[in-house]
Amino acid sequence: MASHLRPPSPLLVRVYKSGPRVRRKLESYFQSSKSSGGGECTVSTQEHEAPGTFRVEFSERAAKERVLKKGEHQILVDEKPVPIFLVPTENSIKKNTRPQISSLTQSQAETPSGDMHQHEGHIPNAVDSCLQKIFLTVTADLNCNLFSKEQRAYITTLCPSIRKMEGHDGIEKVCGDFQDIERIHQFLSEQFLESEQKQQFSPSMTERKPLSQQERDSCISPSEPETKAEQKSNYFEVPLPYFEYFKYICPDKINSIEKRFGVNIEIQESSPNMVCLDFTSSRSGDLEAARESFASEFQKNTEPLKQECVSLADSKQANKFKQELNHQFTKLLIKEKGGELTLLGTQDDISAAKQKISEAFVKIPVKLFAANYMMNVIEVDSAHYKLLETELLQEISEIEKRYDICSKVSEKGQKTCILFESKDRQVDLSVHAYASFIDAFQHASCQLMREVLLLKSLGKERKHLHQTKFADDFRKRHPNVHFVLNQESMTLTGLPNHLAKAKQYVLKGGGMSSLAGKKLKEGHETPMDIDSDDSKAASPPLKGSVSSEASELDKKEKGICVICMDTISNKKVLPKCKHEFCAPCINKAMSYKPICPTCQTSYGIQKGNQPEGSMVFTVSRDSLPGYESFGTIVITYSMKAGIQTEEHPNPGKRYPGIQRTAYLPDNKEGRKVLKLLYRAFDQKLIFTVGYSRVLGVSDVITWNDIHHKTSRFGGPEMYGYPDPSYLKRVKEELKAKGIE
């Protein structure tokens, strides 16, 4: 092709990025009829026009018109969507700089009617579309001195989707998209010109000529009622999404208006994303009342509308999600296309629906990272585990249900290994399972008791206790109780319910005295001290010789560290609760979590690696299931994008910002939890940075191990209400971090 030949339909486009790679992506995009609607074309840079400007030259005019008709375009650059803005060429701008209706006295001869202009009729819409993207909303103050209250009131009929601000003298300010403001400006200009003409000319000269069909088709604002012999006609345009929503919410309203006022309403698409409603009636019909009725109903139902799009990770389930949401949100218009849901409705409904999608239907992965390591197995002393086994197996079963994981318990030498693995590939809550198990293990360890049975009073009967048969029988009958036998006493260690049965079994021979043990969590000199007061309550009064022997045992008995379950060495006493541990054991435990493993007393202020962001809340009158007498506290977290630090998994890498919403009942306990959450947020404990299995990407912001209710409904399995124990649980989670 000769270079001087110019393709018939050039088009300028603008993106926020530039360079050869972007040019190639644009060329590939506009050559794809499936992606853009375009066809054979070439793309060249136009940096002299403005940064990021490219010229697309289509071989066929039809390809260009298909691109313009589609309206919105975008390409992927570095796996991120980049919008494409369509800019008309210089010739197109010159053709369309003239107003659509130059004046009220415009003659039919002045109306463009050539074929070329008909072909280029989409270009103004492309301009409008581009402008609407630049100006999401435009606010205009009206000059009330120029127009009557009635003229200004007609604005809502002209543009039903406009938002108005009224004063004592009617509408004073309007707010809407750029196209609506243009319509209002044109209408008021016509009204002003009419009034000027009435003052300058006779009534016979001010009569308005009927608009030609072409003028009517190109006119944005509604025409004035046009009187004919048998019929009068009027129409206006509204945005297509808003009209679809209106028909969805009020399916019979159009028919009702037609019957009530004796009119006919013809509906057709007038331009991309716009709908024309043509009101016609016979002389007996009330056309103006019908228009006003429709405008009032339309504005009432569409004024608070917002529209948002949600892309789903699994496009096959998009239709299923749409059906589920349609059942729950009857006033939300939901459209599905190619795995993307378009939500049109009030902001509250959209927010609630997005939460359902993100937190319920598509489970959000929550992964916790401890400092510089990721837990994948727990090892405990096998002898210690045996003492707690029945209690821990129940807890493991609860953990499996709570976090949708499976567990595996195995012995390796003197150690018992506990492994948790997620059942769901898209959500991994195993770290929560490990944390819950550690808490349960420490709690159960604190319930262990030791009891010393003195054998002296048994005389010869105690010989059978030293036989192998007794030891084998005891271990078989009481596998969860550890016993140590010497010449003077038998020491039993286990949980209280197991210990009572084992003690009864040993004492069947009679005549054997007992010294009741104490719980490990009591704060005396050593965790395993013998409590003589409990001893007296548990058995008949002992003779002096027995008491003196117990005193000797007190002196010989050494403290046991509940972390390693061995004799305490290099003892360290915690200052608040006075519990004692091996110094290396407690130092290591404190490095993971600065709390006492025995009583959960906090030591020091925990600081997390939460990214920068904000936390705000509002109060809604709507109640939560289970808290019908109270309103709802709505918490909004807005976390900023940033760069990971040394505290995060991949220092130096960027992470995107997110917004999350959580709900609490607006009662005394809920407000208490709100204050605690604010403290946790200040200590950077609410969020962390990790890996999202749903998105398939790393380096994103995820929840930390303080659980939130991110849905109003659905119960615990949907992260919602009712959940009677939630507030208690979250306070315990906060307490474990030193926040109470």
UniProtKB/Swiss-Prot annotation:
Residues with Phosphoserine modification: S9, S202, S221, S532, S539
Listed SUPFAM superfamilies: RING/U-box
Major place of residence: cytoplasm
Keywords, comma-separated and alphabetical: Acetylation, Antiviral defense, Chromatin regulator, Cytoplasm, DNA damage, DNA repair, Endosome, Host-virus interaction, Immunity, Innate immunity, Lysosome, Membrane, Metal-binding, Nucleus, Phosphoprotein, Protein transport, Transferase, Transport, Ubl conjugation, Ubl conjugation pathway, Zinc, Zinc-finger
Membrane topology (UniProt): Peripheral membrane protein
SMART domains tied to this protein: RING (SM00184)
Zinc finger (RING-type): 561-600
GO CC term (a single one): cytosol
Feature: compositional bias, Basic and acidic residues: 206-218
Protein name listed in UniProt: E3 ubiquitin-protein ligase DTX3L
Originating species: Homo sapiens (Human)
Organism lineage string: Eukaryota, Metazoa, Chordata, Craniata, Vertebrata
